[in-house]
Amino acid sequence: MLPSQAPEATKLIVGTRSAWLAARLTVEFNNQSWVVYGYTDASKLGESRKFAAMTLKDRRQHQRDAAKKLLPGLKGALDIAAGRIQAFLAVADAEGLLHLAGDLSEHLADGVNLVHLPDILESALASLRVEKARETMGTAIRQAVRLEDYPESFRAHTRKRRLIAVLGPTNSGKTYDAFKRLAKAESGVYLGPLRLLALEAFNRLNDEFKVPTSLLTGEDRRDVARSKVTASTIEMLNPDRQVDVAVIDEIQMLLDPDRGWAWTQAVVGANASEVWLLGALSAEAAVRALASRLGLELEVHYKERKHPLTVAQNALAGDPIAALRQARKGDAWVVFSRRNALTLRDDFLARGMSVACVYGMLSPEVREREAQRFADGDADILVATDAIGMGLNLPIQRVVFTAVTKFNGEEVQRLEVPMLQQIGGRAGRYGHQPSSKGKQAKDGIVVGLTPDEHRVVVELMQAQQTPLPARGFLIAPSQAYLERLSKLASTERLEALLAAYEQHADQGDGFFRAHVPQEMLDRASMLDAMQNLTLQTKHLLAMVPLSSQHEVLGATWTDWVRKVNRDVPVGLEFLRGHPENAALDKAEMAVQQLWAYLWLSYRLPDSFPMAEDARELLEPWVEAVDLHLRGHARQGAARTAGKAAWYRPAPVRRRF
């Protein structure tokens, strides 16, 4: 249809500096009306401040007067504009772009200088073509990456499998039952969330259960002759290896926002006749949903605590200084930062008590040594962060919460029920709690430091854990997915491919959900700036276990990436000084850097060729950390007489 070229109305357009009279033009195309308010330099009415001071009545009168004078002159410009818009719409329609042109339609209706209309339409057409290409690409990606087909990408999909869920609180014997089953299996694998747990499984299966077991983590590999079982971190799952029994620990981490994808992958892809799922009762609904979706037989076994757990009737003391005097052998005092752990340790040492200390920055080897000192009675008190929530079977008689809030990376939040209950459940660990001959061992006890903390401890220890959702299981972008997307998009830019995966993968009914780990996203842009890295290498470097948030460790990662890009072998020059002279924080960083170097040496051996040297240097640096923690030198914040620098009062909920 031909456009309507007659102006039907006028509009006063007031900009930041000037004001114009615009005339309305309606263009009819394919039964749709495109409304344009157009003006020219000739229809300028003056400075905008003049109109800002007018009343609405005066504005309207001025608009009517201007229309009588200026509309005839605008008609020619409107006629030309109508033809240009008609031509634009015809091209956009032929290329299937009109459904994307909503923003342009609004822009034209708001008012446009007709002198600039050709440039506006040309730019809009180019933008619409880009948007159409993205839309087409999104459709292709949805067809190529269908998350509901995820299970079919694993060999396990073709074999008969049975899920056995063993659910219960801490100290209920779940792991012991699973280890007994692994001991009887012809072949098996243990998959845990931490290198510490894999190491514990490795040691227990070899020493306690007499099962030849190898260790396989991202950083550490120990082959044992004639091994039947492999103890591994969960990300190291080998879905192509067939085994009789696979044990997946801490199954309640299925919906963890950072690492839940690894549990989804393990449940879906573990190539075993029996897949044991160990974890909290809150995971039951999620486990049942997965079993149903995968069409697998499921057995659920419920476990009870082997040793009683009691929440103390009262807080430990009225204030933190008085609470220190109530500390006793067998206590575990819980804090939520490295600084507070070391400062509290210092205060106990000043009172003449021996202390073991465990926190997240420590390597598994040091944590295990510190835990052993406590277990052997060489340390009276254990000071720990939430790092003791998983693993580390210890003879803890009482767990003391010095805080009930934790900084989550963005803000300070109150502890969630599962975390507090899991840490509290470390008290009275089965098989470790000492008892006298013929007498029952004492209950494990959980207590808050002061009344403020204790009120929260009582509330959360009595609370029911919220069941995990039965859908929304995370799937991270595998190398195979990224290569598929790269071919479709004709690019190896990691950032673009990760965004395309998260935005366009076909998520079906939402049972499975596309997820890109934040650390990977944060690193992608810099990796794309490196000209010589393949997509596979960029993907691998994005997963290096070094925190980008830590200034020194982040700088180490950046330096390594640049050297790999230049094809320069990475040496051990990142190590500064000697372990025997290093401060605690320097020694901790050196251990983390060495483990990350070993992680990369398994994957990029040509770029990280000094693995043997790194392994030899690791022990002296681990020993340096251990010596600091076993020593009596102050490691935390400066001490202030009469004050507990490690204590922050719990927020009080006021009642109105």
Feature names for model-found ranges:
Residues S214-V224, T343, S354-T385:
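Conserved helicase ATPase core of P-loop NTP-dependent helicases/translocases
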Residues E219, S227, E284-A327:
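Interdomain hinge/linker at the junction between the two RecA-like core domains of SF2 helicases
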